[in-house]
Amino acid sequence: MMQDPISDMLTRIRNAQAVRKKEVVMPRSKLKMSIANVLKEEGYIVDYREEGDSTKPQLVITLKYHEGESVISEIRRVSSPALQVYKSKDELPKVKNGLGIAIISTSKGVMSDRQARRLGEGGEVLCYVS
């Protein structure tokens, strides 16, 4: 059984980009769909979609490349099931001096650090993307 599905998602993305795959497939969950939505809104992936039936739903992410290089240079898990990292709206980190994003799980849903600051929300820091 998978202990940390978010780490698994990030690792699958990292590994697929390392071998220049166009798409990556993984088990689907609402949280993974929300993270994929933030990655799409911020321009780190081309698109995502659901596949499969209700017994084995899959999430398919279409990766984005620019001049042969992956748009995502680093994607790293911050909070984990063993050590959850929470930040208030004033403590939200700036990733690579604003060139990257932090994906935050707030009471209003999963969003980027910029959007959380705009809404005055803090929450669990899921990962950093740059």
UniProtKB/Swiss-Prot annotation:
One GO-annotated biological process of the protein: translation
Domain of life of the native organism: Bacteria
Keyword Transferase: no
Pfam families given in the database record: Ribosomal_S8
Claim: RNA-binding is one of the keywords in the record: yes
UniProtKB keywords: Ribonucleoprotein, Ribosomal protein, RNA-binding, rRNA-binding
HAMAP family (UniProt xref): Ribosomal_uS8_B (MF_01302_B)
Database matches in PANTHER family: 40S RIBOSOMAL PROTEIN S15A
Name the record gives this protein: Small ribosomal subunit protein uS8
Organism: Coxiella burnetii (strain Dugway 5J108-111)
Name of the coding gene: rpsH
